[in-house]
């Protein structure tokens, strides 16, 4: 059996890593192998389709990488076990199947375009075209497969550090259309860019560390004035601990009713998740209020052990209150009880962290720090004068205002 037919048989029998056959490049390559006995038009169509994909992905000279890297982002029993550091608990026959699959992936990755063309049943009919057909270069495999000798240590270490499935490729997600969707270009903000609010950030960081380490931790409400860095803190923390198995999923506040669906999708995953709800507030009779209350109180749709809820709000009390809410009527003798019920939701977050607008000195310290980070060549006096004028035009001082001012210096 030549290498091409052997490869076709091995790919046909993939088991643990069978999911890679749904990925575009391996799927197109397999379809090419299946067309080896078909008419020239069908074979050449499959060949051209694969070459087109490789060119579009910048892999025309990295065929081996394009094939093997799909295994790094596959979601299977071995990848999940390795992510949790429990691959040693897998049955021996599963481990053996993983090794066989890895051999199959490597066999496919090493095949050259010349070998495939030579194996075509009707090669004589296209011999005049073969010299001008595009050819791929094999190149090197993905690092975990480079020099594979039967040991799964490199692959296990990769999953342990990066996670499995789409959670290995992406670190930030959003709940949309009833499913978890990756965020292709997340905010890259990190902890080193912050100035001020050290006490508030340390509270959230310490709570997150306890969560990652499996210690006692709390759902967290970050509340206070707009533009003070509440959302940025959550995003920066998610970036800071991504290599510790932490992922962030943003849940739009108008989809809180979907919380049980989200729980079902992440509960069994060997990763930690922050469920992020931004700009949280409710109107009376809001069904989402009841859903979140049940989650925080530990109802049937309670959050799993591998998830925490981090919410931000401009309000300490999350249910908007109107004058009419304070008006007693004959029909409603429990107005006070209803008000207390509405105002108590925020108390169900175990950790509440307050962000207030900075003082003038704190505001200017933030400006100076950001200006230094960006390499601005201005004196503190010049920065202070410009920043204060900018803040007046923006309705007040805040970290957001400070950042916008520094950015405006480059416009």
Question: What are the residue ranges of the model-derived segments?
Answer:
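AAA+ P-loop ATPase mechanoenzymes
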Residues: 1-195, 199
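C-terminal alpha-helical "lid" subdomain
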Residues: 352, 356-411
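AAA+/P-loop NTPase substrate/partner-engagement loops
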Residues: 240-273, 281-285
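Conserved AAA+ ATPase "SRH/arginine-finger" region at the nucleotide-binding site
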Residues: 330-343, 350-364
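Conserved catalytic/switch belt of AAA+ P-loop NTPases
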Residues: 267-268, 283-331, 337
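Walker A/P-loop nucleotide-binding motif
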Residues: 197, 214-234
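Phosphate-binding P-loop
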Residues: 182-185, 209-217
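Pre-Walker A adenine-sensing motif
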Residues: 198-213
């Amino acid at each position: 059996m030549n290498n091409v037919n052997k490869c076709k048989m091995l790919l046909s029998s993939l088991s643990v890593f069978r999911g890679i056959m749904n990925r575009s490049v391996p799927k197109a390559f397999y379809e090419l192998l299946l067309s080896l006995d078909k008419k020239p038009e069908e074979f050449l169509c499959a060949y051209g389709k694969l070459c087109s994909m490789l060119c579009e992905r910048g892999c025309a000279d990295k065929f081996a990488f394009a094939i093997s890297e799909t295994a790094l982002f596959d979601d299977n029993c071995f990848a999940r076990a390795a992510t949790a550091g429990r691959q040693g608990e897998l049955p021996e026959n599963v481990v053996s199947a993983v090794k066989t699959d890895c051999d199959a992936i490597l066999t496919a990755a090493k095949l050259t375009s010349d070998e495939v063309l030579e194996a075509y049943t009707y090669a004589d009919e296209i011999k005049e075209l073969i010299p001008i057909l595009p050819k791929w270069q094999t190149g090197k495999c993905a690092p975990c497969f480079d020099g594979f000798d039967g040991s799964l240590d490199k692959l296990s270490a990769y999953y342990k550090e990066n996670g499995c499935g789409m959670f290995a490729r992406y670190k930030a997600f959003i709940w949309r259309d009833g499913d978890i969707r990756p965020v292709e270009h997340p905010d890259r903000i990190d902890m080193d860019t912050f100035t001020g609010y050290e006490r508030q950030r340390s509270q959230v960081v310490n709570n997150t560390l306890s969560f990652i380490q499996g210690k006692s931790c709390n759902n967290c409400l970050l509340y206070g004035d707009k533009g003070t860095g509440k959302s940025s803190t959550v995003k920066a923390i998610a970036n800071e601990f991504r290599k510790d198995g932490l992922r962030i999923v943003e849940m739009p506040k108008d989809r809180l009713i979907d919380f049980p669906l989200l729980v079902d999708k992440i509960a069994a995953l060997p990763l930690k998740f922050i469920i992020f709800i931004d700009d949280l507030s409710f109107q009376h009779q809001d069904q989402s209020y009841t859903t979140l209350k049940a989650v925080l109180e530990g109802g049937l749709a309670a959050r799993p052990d591998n998830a925490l809820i981090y919410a931000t709000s401009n309000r300490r009390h999350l249910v908007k209150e109107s004058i009419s809410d304070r008006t007693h009527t004959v029909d409603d003798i429990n107005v006070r009880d209803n008000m207390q019920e509405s105002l108590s939701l925020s108390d169900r977050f175990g950790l509440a962290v307050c962000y207030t607008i900075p003082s003038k000195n704190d505001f200017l310290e933030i400006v100076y720090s950001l200006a230094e980070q960006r390499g601005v060549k201005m004196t503190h006096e010049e920065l202070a004068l410009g920043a204060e004028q900018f803040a007046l035009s923006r309705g007040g001082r805040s970290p957001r205002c400070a950042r916008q001012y520094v950015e405006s210096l480059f416009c």
